Amino acid sequence: MTTAVERFLKYVSYDTQSDEAYDTCPSTEKQLLLANELKRELEEMGASDVRMSEYGYLFACIPDNTDSTSAPQEAEASFSTASAHGASDVGQKATIPALGFISHIDTAPSLTGTNVKPRIVQAYDGKDIVLNAEKQIVMKVSEFPFLADLKGQDLIVTDGTTLLGADDKAGVAEIMTMAEYFL
């Protein structure tokens, strides 16, 4: 199974920078390159009903993997809507509510997404992070005090010359890894 980190590092290599000059969805064709890769991955995993809209929205289904007739008693409470859908008899399969996960793939137009150079800072030491020594780009703890809370964690950073796209592409990597797990 591919890890979320492996997926994330792959996905950040796709330039999905948006362009505010266009009132289209997606605002750039290059966003479709990653969307098509995600579609291919979902199909390869065995997701059902994998489809992309004319606007680049990607959808897929993961079939339920529960058999409510053999679910433990405690689980029945968590599916409180099951009896409302007519599955109150013992031995009848309950209707389990669907759950959706959403993420976007476009990155901000303010900084390029081309030639992203991610790097993993292992066991972050709590000090300033030199993103790019040559260009003197440093992520200073004094400017980003939340970094103190991340001491000891592995961090994925860029070299400071591009966006990493971490908000969206990390979400996509997590969703895809979860999908693979359940499929």
Locations of the language-model features?
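Generic structural signal for well-ordered, non-membrane alpha-helical segments
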Residues: M1-A4, S27-Q31, A35, D168-G171
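Active-site metal-coordination/substrate-binding segment of hydrolases
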Residues: T95-E174, M178-L183
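Alpha-helical scaffold segments in soluble metabolic enzymes
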Residues: R7-K10, E37-R40, E174-T177, Y181
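N-terminal capping segment at the start of a domain
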Residues: T2-E29, V157
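Generic secondary-structure signature for well-ordered alpha-helical cores
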Residues: K10-Q17, E43-A47, E180-L183
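Intrinsically disordered, low-complexity terminal tails and inter-domain linkers enriched
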Residues: T66-T95
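Short, acidic Gly/Pro/Ser/Thr-rich loop/turn segments
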Residues: S18-D19, D67, D106-S110
